[in-house]
Amino acid sequence: MRKFKTTFTALALGCVFALSGCNGNPGNHSASGKPDPDFSETVETTDLYDYTGKTEKEFQFKTFVGVPSNMRIYNSLETSFYIKTLTDAELDTYYKELSEAGFTVADGPYFPEDQAHYRKVLDLAQKYGMKQMVGELVVNGISLSAMLRGEIIDSTTGKPAEYTDEQIKAHLEACLGEFKDHPAFYGFSYWDEPNATKYDTIARIQKLFQEVFPGKILYVNLLPITVDLSLLGYTNPADRIKYTTDFIEKIDVPYISYDRYPLYKDASSGKREIQEDFLYNMQVYRQAADIDGRELWTYLQSTGHLGAGTEYVEPKSIADFRWQVNSFLSFGGSGISWFTTFAPPPVDGVGTQFNVGPYDRKGRKTDIYYKIKAVQEEVHAFEDVYFNFDWKNVMTVLGKENEVGYCEGFTYLDEGFAIDTHERIAEYSCQQDTLIGCFEDKDGYDGFMITNYANPADNKTDRVSLTFNDAKAVAVYRLAEKRVLLLNEDGTFNITLQPGEGIFVV
């Protein structure tokens, strides 16, 4: 919000999550698809005020596990499968569906593909307004990923083979060169969850990659900061945060990306719970991104899976998806990959067991597809306003109905990271634990991303009351709809957030 002494401030409220079947028609809808009576309970519409700041930037929604050329079609017990080669028409249909669901970047498939497949899907990505990330390729008998990671073993020495810069650039050209000028070519999916001992290698490859493909993305996704220290590549506990800061210092990419899947089943109670370090990972990676102004990207949970003794549950409701995305938006995130999109095998090479996500193991859309579609449509509907702001900090508010007196996710944050007050907010109260992400645009307007942080499995609504200093009106984006509303005389706005829901207030 801009700071005015004698005039009002226009506020923009943006609820970022659509529901299945929402078509943007007038009327506000709750998680059941019915009108929400609290949407304009204490305000009336006006055409006198507005917030008009906008950008052309697009929120990035990426697939993880893309469309294959040969799809494994499993039997009902998932004990066997046959291979189905997808026709050009079937490939076209899948890309059309991904585009319609709001995906902006398609990743490569689970298993390696050849260049012929990527020629087809690059054209399809362009046709439907998307970008295509290329995955593993083997050309002239040499794996691109293995070469770039230093994993090819010299048969004569038994040690990793060494390649000159020119040899690496030549293989990059051989594998990806024909795609470099394609309008849909996004980059190369390089390394998932490396430890810090690999950073020098990644830095070298990024430099060479940019010499061959300037401006394209060499994609690296990092581990949760809370995993075992040895997995991060350090031995001293005091060095844990260096996993992120060393990446920023050594590797010149325009983003930092990580994963932390938050929804799990408690082994003792059987209850669906939230990982207490979900927000802490956001904090650490947000702080790293802010060192030099990088994009903050993450992976979120669309597929239930069982691995390393933890059962990550399948998101069941629209609230599960809204809650994940809205929490990330409260920390100023700008890109999300869904883990997973097209179904991986039932069990992977290290024993992790997978359910399915937006597509099942017969290649059919699931209910998850429609929930993700709804969420992504709503984010795209207000992204031009959201990206007009820069993230500054976050407030954590304990809800009035919190009976234990603390929220594990909030207490996990470093002391002093979350702020307690903001000059624009005179008073606030929340029924449930609530996040308030604080933003500011180039003209001095303040923005707030307010999220119902209650466990979506508990299905609790969050009655939020905010009193703003020096403000008379709000412009509201909710479910692909914009309304401009007058505040109460004292600057108060009241709203009931559905489970997992969020609003953006300018």
What are the residue ranges of the model-derived segments?
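Bacterial N-terminal signal peptides that target proteins for export
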Residues: 1-11
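C-terminal motif of bacterial Sec signal peptides marking the signal peptidase cleavage site
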Residues: 18-21
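Bacterial signal peptide processing site
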Residues: 23-26
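Glycan-processing catalytic domains of CAZymes
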Residues: 33-473, 477-506
